[in-house]
Amino acid sequence: MRQLTSDKVYELDLPFPLGIVDGNRVYLSGRTARDPETGYPIDGIEEQTERVLTDIEVLLEEAGTSIDNVVQATIYLASMSDIGVVNDIYEEYMTEPYPARSAVEVSDLAADFDIEIEVVAALEE
C-alpha cells in the first residue's frame, strides 16, 4: 500500500492522504474544490464540480490509471437541487459504462463547499 502525493492539486495538512494505492485499486479521499494556488474554496457549483473532477483526473493519472477506470463514485452535495448541473458536468468526464455511483445530500460540507466527490478506480494492467 502506498499514499498518493501530488504537487499538481491542493493538499491540506490533515491526517489523511490524497489517496491510497492498494493492490490493483486506487482509493481517492473526498475531493473538494480549492483554488490550487491559494487553497481557498472556489465559488459556484459548476466551477466546483469542474475543479473536483479535474483534480480526480490528475490524481488518477499520477497513480498510474485514468478517470476511464473509475469503478465507483460517491458524490456529496450540499443541495440535491444541484444534481442536474452536476450530472451534466459528470458526463463530460465519465464515459459509458458509467461507474457505480451514489449521490447524497448532506447537511454540511467543510468550508461551505457545495460538492465533494470520492472515487475508487482500477489500475491499468
Task: Name what the model sees in each region.
Residues 1-54, 58-63, 68-71, 77-125:
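N-terminal presequence-like segments and the immediate start of the first folded domain
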